[in-house]
Amino acid sequence: MTGLEPFGARLRRAMDERGPLCVGIDPHSSLLAEWGLDDSVSGLETFSRTVVEAVAGRVAVLKPQSAFFERFGSRGVAVLEKTVQEARAAGALVVMDAKRGDIGSTMAAYAESFLHRDAPLFSDALTVSPYLGYGSLSPAVALARESGTGLFVLALTSNPEGGEVQHAVRADGRTIGATMLGHLALENAGEEPLGSFGAVVGATLGDLSSYDLDVNGPILAPGIGAQGATAADLPAVFGSAVRNVVPNVSRGVLRHGPDVVALRDAAERFAEEIRTAVTAA
């Protein structure tokens, strides 16, 4: 399989050219209703097409949440396929937010579903869960290297329940979250200008100075907007790693739909706020 240019290099270029903003595509039923759309495959398709039209190619990343498509069965997955393909054709990098995690051949099959160049759902990167052991991700790591794609590994997530696992302390004195960050630093060692194996770290977590976030890879940071974090918080939370942060905004942008211009304006406002905060750090 002939791979793309590595995901980390493509992402760094997109961040430099368009700013680091990631816009989530989260068509949950209440948001479809706010847009005046039916909670149906038709509503799902209209919603997704509108978001892609509004912001693809204007922000660094689009991140569809696969569960909101999967709930409609095969017809919803068909809409997801179309959404991914149209977003990439319009110039966006697509991170599939599927949070897959398993072992052996099953993990390999999950990786092939999203990271193999011939897959209908082929995306630029995939979110994965390492909590069957980081080594369980090795099939996905190998395929990502081969295909020029990337992974975002759940490390320090923004949901309160995550701390039960991620802040647990191992026998060697390190937390589970810190261990995951250490694995990513090894994956990305020596990569320029940016490694392809990133961490998911919540922007709402406050002071993370006890963690080494410099993994030489991207940090996908949910929590900006509706969850309470702001662009101005990013330097304090992420410190010297802030230049590698890809802040995710979903509802803060999507609530401005269904008007394409309003969606685009909201995304551009967030992008400018983030760019200003990162530049000033």
Question: Across the structure, where does each feature detected by a protein language model lie?
Answer:
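Active-site-adjacent beta->alpha loops and helix N-cap segments on the catalytic face
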Residues: 71-86, 103-109, 132-145, 204-212, ...
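C-terminal helical cap(s) of enzyme catalytic domains, especially alpha/beta-barrels
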Residues: 234-244, 253-281
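Conserved anion-binding
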Residues: 98-198
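Acidic (Asp/Glu)-rich catalytic clusters
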Residues: 15-16, 52-58, 84-89, 141-147, ...
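A C-terminal functional module that forms or caps the active site or interfaces directly
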Residues: 199, 203-248, 252-253
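Conserved, mostly hydrophobic/aromatic
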Residues: 23, 62, 97, 126, ...
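Short, well-ordered coil/turn segments that N-cap beta-strands
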Residues: 17-21, 57-60, 90-92, 122-124, ...
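Conserved N-terminal beta1-alpha1 strand-loop-helix module at the mouth
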Residues: 1-64, 70-82, 86-95, 172, ...
